């Protein structure tokens, strides 16, 4: 996922500090990753999430997602006279077998859910949506109208592959945070296919929020474009999201550190929970950097720093005359000091405000719409077409590709000899 470097780079507190060799994350446990799985947290917050259905996946379906190549079940179509003409064609015997025969119940449940949700859904697995594979879809987004639309996105996505193959990378067992992943077996993941009713979200009103020690530390917009209308609304949106977090999430989510995404549609009176992500480097910090977030002070850190400063004092040895002079000076300054103390107390009582970062008009990221997202995950159309035609199509494509390379090498050698 894309990262954006922050304008404000974190500063070292002293020149004597050693440079960090790794981000100072607390250990990420297996349970934290599972707590951020959709099937775990969505039942806790069903009333504040968009309408969805989580379908438990069988081992056969998970194996289908993991398998190389893209073989889709035959489409359900109404037969026509033209179809009957091809009933006994030579190609009928060479068709790929229907993979859905091994998970018919799941296939039927997916079709039923699509119908229940008005004919359009968006898919995701436990943690990730196949956003990197939308270039495979005719609509160039996550909108799916048939089961095959869903299968095509899931099997083309590197994000989904990561969910399947590497969900616990960099994690440690819960019993001993000092242990490594090799010290204990990784837990089994109950994989689910999440289908959400398709809603045309306004991307400018989606926000990512970072929580540490059950404190909303900072938040930012998710879409990486400039939206001028957000700036007058910044304080109102921050207040609305803060109240939502305090009431719905702060004390109910199992872990003290996590990242959550919200959607605040017009008229901006209600907040919807869209996703919960791990407090880990795998989660995109978007307009922040993780080092910046990890070094931010929350109310507890600010209070500890102030208490440390108060404990620093100087002992003075005074004789009688010096003591009298000092007492007179203290009497003169008592009024001003009292006023300063009152001001300090007022500052202490002011609420902690999380930083709310938006993309400004002159930021380099302000016009990211000209850059396609997830371009590193895309393949040429010829490769996709070959993979859809089965192993034979891919073999034929590789043969042609080798012929092209050999021809180019031969032409290059001929040019070198001519020179």
UniProtKB/Swiss-Prot annotation:
<dbReference type="GO" id="GO:0005737">
    <property type="term" value="C:cytoplasm"/>
</dbReference>
<feature type="region of interest" description="Disordered">
    <location>
        <begin position="328"/>
        <end position="351"/>
    </location>
</feature>
<keyword id="KW-0132">Cell division</keyword>
<dbReference type="Pfam" id="PF07065">
    <property type="entry name" value="D123"/>
</dbReference>
<protein>
    <recommendedName>
        <fullName>Cell division cycle protein 123</fullName>
    </recommendedName>
</protein>
<keyword id="KW-0963">Cytoplasm</keyword>
<feature type="region of interest" description="Disordered">
    <location>
        <begin position="1"/>
        <end position="23"/>
    </location>
</feature>
<feature type="compositionally biased region" description="Polar residues">
    <location>
        <begin position="7"/>
        <end position="18"/>
    </location>
</feature>
<feature type="region of interest" description="Disordered">
    <location>
        <begin position="73"/>
        <end position="102"/>
    </location>
</feature>
<comment type="function">
    <text>Regulates the cell cycle in a nutrient dependent manner.</text>
</comment>
<feature type="compositionally biased region" description="Acidic residues">
    <location>
        <begin position="328"/>
        <end position="350"/>
    </location>
</feature>
<dbReference type="GO" id="GO:0051301">
    <property type="term" value="P:cell division"/>
</dbReference>
<dbReference type="InterPro" id="IPR009772">
    <property type="entry name" value="CDC123"/>
</dbReference>
<comment type="similarity">
    <text>Belongs to the CDC123 family.</text>
</comment>
<keyword id="KW-0131">Cell cycle</keyword>
<feature type="compositionally biased region" description="Acidic residues">
    <location>
        <begin position="78"/>
        <end position="99"/>
    </location>
</feature>
